[in-house]
């Protein structure tokens, strides 16, 4: 657990009733910042403070994962993490979530959870050769990334990222008017031999995400595959602050990826936020049995 810039009040933001919206498969864009950046930037001086309690988690929801064959249990565990995760030594209720390797069926189940029924959701599918949506092998719909917010979310988009044809990647993005913030969730190409073993596509994907720096308030959450010291992450560390980086902007942070024994082995999960925001961040020291990644939670204060 770290408090890299400022230990902020751990207050949940109460959201009004939200209309659930989901990104359509044809809603791809090349430049998110060109559509919403000016509207948020013009109001920069007048923006009220906002606190976003955000959690990012690669839930490993497909077949071959710890709970891949038990989707109902995985959805319950996600909801439990949202109800209370440790940040800055306190248990905090989350009002935003970024999920990776999640199936559309899991999101549908979460929408029926009592506490989450009023949340807004954005979903962006992973794709196979030719651009077809990648199906979850466990019958849970489409595999992809999702963003959920307690407050209403608008301008929901699927942001297609440069990717190898066999494993198409996208970011799911939406704007929360109550926070005057743009949120994007992503999972970059993996280092598998048949995906992006040399990292050339991840570099291009990170470059595309860097365009979001034009926004006044931004949170980008997800599994970036790379470790903090990787040069591939240089553009993001220059443009944003990472919630768990150490003093003097050192690129550190608690490890989020764990091996089959539950031992943490690397930090590959991140919450990049606007540098004007303050944040407190936390990763559980207890192994999770639901995934090969531990959730990363943060309280972000936009001032």
Which residue stretches match the model-derived regions?
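Structured beta-strand-rich core segments of catalytic domains in phosphoester-bond hydrolases
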Residues: 37-40, 44, 96-180, 188, ...
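A short acidic, helix-capping loop that chelates divalent metal ions and anchors anionic groups
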Residues: 62-65, 129-135, 142, 192-195, ...
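Active-site beta-strand/loop signature of hydrolases that rely on acidic residues for catalysis
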Residues: 53-59, 78-110, 148, 174, ...
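N-terminal, active-site-proximal structural segment of metallo-dependent hydrolase catalytic domains
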Residues: 2-113, 132, 303
């Amino acid at each position: 657990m770290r408090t890299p810039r400022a230990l902020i009040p751990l207050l949940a933001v109460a959201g009004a009733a939200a209309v659930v919206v989901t990104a359509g498969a044809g809603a791809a864009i090349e430049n998110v910042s060109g559509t919403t950046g000016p509207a948020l930037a013009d109001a920069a001086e007048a923006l009220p403070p906002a606190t976003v309690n955000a959690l990012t988690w690669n839930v490993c929801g497909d077949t071959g994962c710890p709970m891949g064959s038990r989707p109902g249990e995985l959805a319950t565990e996600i909801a439990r993490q949202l109800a209370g995760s440790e940040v800055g030594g306190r248990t905090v209720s989350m009002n935003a979530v970024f999920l990776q390797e999640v199936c559309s069926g899991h999101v549908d189940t979460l929408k029926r959870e009592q506490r989450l029924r009023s949340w807004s959701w954005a979903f962006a599918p992973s794709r196979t050769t030719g651009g077809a949506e990648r199906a979850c092998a466990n019958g849970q719909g489409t595999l992809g990334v999702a963003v959920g917010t307690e407050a209403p979310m608008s301008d929901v988009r699927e942001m297609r990222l440069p990717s190898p044809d066999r494993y198409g990647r996208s970011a799911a993005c939406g704007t929360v008017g109550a926070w005057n913030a743009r949120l994007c969730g992503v999972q970059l190409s993996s280092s598998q031999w048949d995906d992006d073993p040399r990292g050339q596509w991840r570099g291009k994907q990170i470059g595309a995400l860097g365009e979001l720096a034009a926004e006044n308030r931004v949170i980008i959450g997800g599994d970036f595959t790379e470790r903090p010291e990787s040069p591939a992450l240089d553009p993001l560390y220059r443009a944003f602050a990472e919630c768990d980086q150490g003093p003097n902007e050192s690129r550190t942070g608690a490890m989020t990826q764990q091996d089959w024994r539950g031992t943490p082995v690397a930090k590959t999960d991140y919450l990049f936020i606007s540098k004007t925001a303050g944040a407190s961040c936390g990763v559980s020291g207890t192994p999770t049995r639901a995934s090969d990644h531990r959730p990363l939670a943060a309280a972000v204060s936009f001032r």
